[in-house]
A protein has these predicted regions:
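Post-cleavage N-terminal segment of exported redox proteins
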Residues: 2-9, 13-65, 99-164, 187-190, ...
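Short, flexible, mixed-charge glycine/proline-rich loop motifs
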Residues: 69, 73-77, 171-175
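The canonical Cys-X-X-Cys-His
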Residues: 77-89, 138, 166, 176-189, ...
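Acidic helix-start/capping segments at beta-turn-to-alpha-helix junctions
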Residues: 82-98, 156-157
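Cys-dependent condensing catalytic cores that perform Claisen condensation/acyl-transfer
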Residues: 237
């Protein structure tokens, strides 16, 4: 039996168990259609050892990507460097506003999408693969400039249908285990799943260094992992489905401060 299958079966059986138990530290939402009452970052669900790793910039491996991103930001490629248009201060607060509806492209884009727009439109370079190291360098460096700042995505106007699509995705059961995101992250957070605390599934730590990956990765990669865990068909990185879900998750986080590069298990 493969690792993903074993993990998925463990998840299903554990969820049946936690729903049969009295609530622990979690308070199940009275209205599952609304965001949780008190959003908590994944930071609150870490072991003491992992928490210490995140808090120490010298021990947090994610800062290796941030440092590489600082160099990539200054590097002349194509028609010039990112720094030719943006000094480092100009990046402060930028990551808090994504995903957002882009008027020129007439679609929703996240920070990685904005990086690729700059590459193709300004630097005359091909778009980066969304999980490529250079993309992770740049996205982690830019997001780090907004560390500690609250998210502030727009959900009005043309972004509104995207939010609804993301919400629908969050509540939709999927996969052979027939589970929805909200069953773990709204209804069961704070309960134990095979020795680990179930978190609220908040996105504010990404790009994040995951111990399971032994590397830094994007939120969309984490979404793929979740869907694999319930034996569902995964969406493509950067797909409309994941962009909509990302918008919903950021809105659901209710202005949690950004932590990237976070460390997660």
């Amino acid at each position: 039996m493969g690792y993903r299958l074993t993990l998925g079966l463990m998840l299903a059986s554990a969820l049946l168990l936690v729903h049969a138990q009295a609530p622990g530290m979690a308070q199940v939402m009275q209205n599952s259609e609304a965001p949780i009452d008190k959003p908590l970052s994944g930071y609150h669900f870490l072991t003491p050892e992992t928490l210490a790793m995140q808090q120490d910039e010298f021990a947090n491996p994610g800062y290796l990507w941030v440092a590489a991103g600082a160099e990539a930001f200054q590097q002349n490629v194509g028609t010039g460097s990112c720094a030719n248009c943006h000094d480092s201060k100009a990046m402060v607060g930028v990551a808090t506003r994504y995903p957002k509806f882009d008027e020129s492209a007439q679609t929703l884009i996240n920070l990685e999408g904005q990086i690729n727009q700059c590459r193709t439109n300004r630097q005359q370079l091909p778009a980066l693969a969304l999980e490529s190291q250079r993309m992770l360098y740049l996205s982690s460096f830019i997001t780090r400039q907004s560390q500690g700042m609250a998210t502030s995505v727009s959900i009005r106007g043309p972004a509104a249908p995207w939010l609804e699509r993301g919400k629908d995705y969050f509540f939709q059961r999927r996969g052979q285990l027939n589970l929805a995101c909200h069953q773990c992250h709204d209804q069961s957070w704070g309960k134990m799943l095979r020795g680990d605390l179930i978190s609220q599934g908040q996105p504010n730590g990404f790009p994040a260094y995951r111990l399971e990956w032994q590397g830094l990765g994007s939120l969309h990669r984490r979404l793929q992992d979740c869907e694999s865990g319930v034996r569902a068909k995964t969406q493509e990185l950067g797909s409309d489905a994941y962009l909509a879900l990302e918008l919903y998750l950021v809105w659901r986080s209710q202005k949690l401060p950004l932590e990237s590069p976070a460390v997660r298990r």
